[in-house]
Design a protein with these regions (language model features):
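Phosphate- and other anionic-substrate recognition elements at nucleic-acid/protein interfaces
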Residues: 1-178
């Protein structure tokens, strides 16, 4: 549909990660952490729901403080599980970037708030865009689809990149639903 191989990942530290892939059609997979880089190495863009860098100090990175100022909620990186997720995210980012993949950090809840979409609305949008899943979607699956939407919007130039010295987060421009 878009002529690009794109993906969205809801990264997990305790179970296989939910991965939404656009390559011809849209499909959702569950992938063990050790297989993620290999499975995603041929993608052009991968958006990830996980911190991809660690803060230099404190609970939030500089660009996250800007997102918090806008009224969105994020989990602090001084929580042990978030720190572990950030370490995995950083490893995945480095592995994929070595393969030439563009890796984006995003936050699905914030994405859906900006676009005014509920989880159900997001799934309906992805069905219109080519997703034909046969099973009930978990919250992780919906987050992976939301990340995939960010990859699509990135290719279309319909995103804002909130940048800082400690990394960046990619968010949709308001009203940018394809």
């Amino acid at each position: 549909m878009w002529g690009h191989d794109l993906a969205g990942v809801d990264l997990s530290i305790t179970r296989p990660s939910a991965v939404a892939i656009l390559s011809g059609g849209i499909k959702i997979l569950r992938v063990e952490y050790g297989e993620l880089a290999t499975r995603l190495s041929k993608m052009e863009v991968v958006a990830v729901d996980a911190p991809l860098t660690l803060p230099k100090g404190g609970a939030f990175r500089d660009f996250e403080r800007e997102i918090l100022r806008r009224g969105f909620r994020l989990l602090p990186l001084n929580i042990k599980s978030m720190r572990e997720l950030a370490l995995r995210g950083s490893e995945l980012r480095k592995a994929l970037e070595q393969e030439g993949v563009i890796v984006l950090e995003t936050h699905p809840t914030t994405v859906r708030r900006i676009l005014g979409l509920s989880r159900k609305d997001l799934v309906q949008l992805m069905v219109r865009m080519g997703y034909h899943g046969e099973r009930l979607l978990s919250p992780d699956d919906v987050d992976a689809l939301t990340c995939l939407l960010i990859s699509i919007l990135y290719v279309e130039g319909k995103v804002e990149i909130v940048r800082g010295e400690e990394g960046s987060m990619v968010l949709p421009l308001p009203g940018s639903i394809p």
